[in-house]
């Protein structure tokens, strides 16, 4: 039975099946048409949680058989694929969270389904991505590093043409936030598909995170939003996964539609992020950053409650610390 047949007919794939799939997808010598058929077929099936763990571990082990660890490190990112074309919320959040002293290792990529991915924005900001080897030095100095997925996982470049061809979210959107080169203590992940929240939360637990939040934003975003109830799966330090809804209005933030968070080109997104960090933008765009930064600070144990996290995020923008972090990352 071929791998394609097994993908189409088997309810649960073996770890060996998943390794075979990954080996094909990352091979430079196998044609795009074969990869397209396998990846599109796999993304249409009901993915089992253990399979996601197999995929993530297979990719990590291929590049980092002895995965490096930085105690207390955190990643804040979304899966992408929500088609919202929002500005780079999680990248903006990273400056705020790092300015609180959280060690943030943000693992990002160029855009697949939107106008401007994290790496596109960093290029516009004149902020260099960091190599995996140099990450500890920069974290010690600046509390923040941006690692480009194509640099940390050069094997991923062999998947990019296929992902572009498919033109919609695939299993790799779920995998992206989970393959940070570093073993993390904390993580916050936004997921485009609410049916995948539990699956991602359990996989994050398998990966050994101490605390995490996996969320799906109200009305379909992969960030917490201001437009209604956000779905939350929280991994606690005792290994429990609890789920609940969170509405920004319960924390003193005004209701706002997701359309308020529309971004544009890297140049336009730079202007949006900078105006939030320098305090000029007091609109709902600022509030959505405060909400996501507040959640991140809560996960990273900088505060005891989400409300305190939002309050701390507000202070870090208002007192200029978040903007200072931006300038520090630019080498100014």
Curated annotation (Swiss-Prot):
Pathway: Amino-acid biosynthesis; L-tryptophan biosynthesis; L-tryptophan from chorismate: step 2/5. Anthranilate 1 binds at residues 78, 109. Homodimer. Its EC number is 2.4.2.18. Catalyzes the transfer of the phosphoribosyl group of 5-phosphorylribose-1-pyrophosphate (PRPP) to anthranilate to yield N-(5'-phosphoribosyl)-anthranilate (PRA). It comes from the Bacteria. Its cofactor is Mg(2+). Gene3D superfamilies: Nucleoside phosphorylase/phosphoribosyltransferase catalytic domain. This is Anthranilate phosphoribosyltransferase. 5-phospho-alpha-D-ribose 1-diphosphate binds at residues 78, 81-82, 86, 88-91, 106-114, 118. GO terms for molecular function: anthranilate phosphoribosyltransferase activity; magnesium ion binding. Mg(2+) 2 binds at residues 222-223. It catalyses: N-(5-phospho-beta-D-ribosyl)anthranilate + diphosphate = 5-phospho-alpha-D-ribose 1-diphosphate + anthranilate. Transmembrane segments: none annotated.
